[in-house]
């Protein structure tokens, strides 16, 4: 079982900046980050999210998002891919960074999930 990280943001700059930050502590994990629409504007796109999921080399993906439609697109993609997605409702930067660092260090999925549960955003 291989695990990877997927980041979905409405902003191309947030997605690329967070990916760059994560690469400082997690150089070897499978990481994809998508932000914005096809034309570079703010928003999310089902097709771009699906591509980010499919481009990730891992079979089991820990996914992180910034706002509502990013979550909605992850939910839709999770129904249409063979990959196993776990969608975390945690702060995007802190959650993705923590999960990536732990994954790089060889932590189990359960250990990562336990750490992220402390960050859960209540509805």
UniProtKB/Swiss-Prot annotation:
Induction: Induced by dihydroxyacetone via the DhaQ-DhaS complex. Signal peptide: none annotated. It comes from Lactococcus lactis subsp. lactis (strain IL1403). Residues 2-123 form the PTS EIIA type-4 domain. One of its GO terms (cellular component) is membrane. It is an enzyme of class 2 (transferase). Keywords: ATP-binding, Glycerol metabolism, Kinase, Nucleotide-binding, Phosphotransferase system, Transferase. Homodimer. The dihydroxyacetone kinase complex is composed of a homodimer of DhaM, a homodimer of DhaK and the subunit DhaL. Pathway: Polyol metabolism; glycerol degradation. This is PTS-dependent dihydroxyacetone kinase, phosphotransferase subunit DhaM. Pfam families: EIIA-man. Its EC number is 2.7.1.121. GO terms for molecular function: ATP binding; phosphoenolpyruvate-glycerone phosphotransferase activity. GO terms for biological process: glycerol catabolic process; phosphoenolpyruvate-dependent sugar phosphotransferase system. The gene is dhaM. NCBIfam families: dha_pts (TIGR02364). It catalyses: dihydroxyacetone + phosphoenolpyruvate = dihydroxyacetone phosphate + pyruvate. Component of the dihydroxyacetone kinase complex, which is responsible for the phosphoenolpyruvate (PEP)-dependent phosphorylation of dihydroxyacetone. DhaM serves as the phosphoryl donor. Is phosphorylated by phosphoenolpyruvate in an EI- and HPr-dependent reaction, and a phosphorelay system on histidine residues finally leads to phosphoryl transfer to DhaL and dihydroxyacetone. The keyword Nucleotide-binding applies. The keyword Ribonucleoprotein does not apply. Unlike the carbohydrate-specific transporters of the PTS, the complex DhaKML has no transport activity. The active site is at residue 10. The EIIA type-4 domain is phosphorylated by phospho-HPr on a histidyl residue. Then, it transfers the phosphoryl group to the EIIB type-4 domain.
């Amino acid at each position: 079982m291989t695990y990877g990280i997927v980041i979905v943001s409405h902003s191309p700059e947030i997605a690329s900046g967070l990916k760059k930050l994560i690469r400082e502590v997690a150089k070897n994990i499978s990481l994809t980050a998508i932000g914005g629409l096809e034309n570079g504007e703010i928003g999310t796109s089902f097709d771009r999210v699906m591509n980010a999921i499919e481009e990730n080399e891992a079979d089991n993906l820990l996914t992180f998002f910034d706002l509502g439609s990013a979550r909605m697109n992850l939910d839709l993609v999770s129904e249409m891919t063979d990959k196993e997605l776990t969608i975390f409702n945690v702060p995007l930067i802190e959650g993705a960074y923590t999960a990536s660092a732990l994954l790089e260090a060889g932590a189990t999925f359960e250990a990562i999930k336990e750490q992220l549960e402390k960050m859960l955003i209540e509805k």
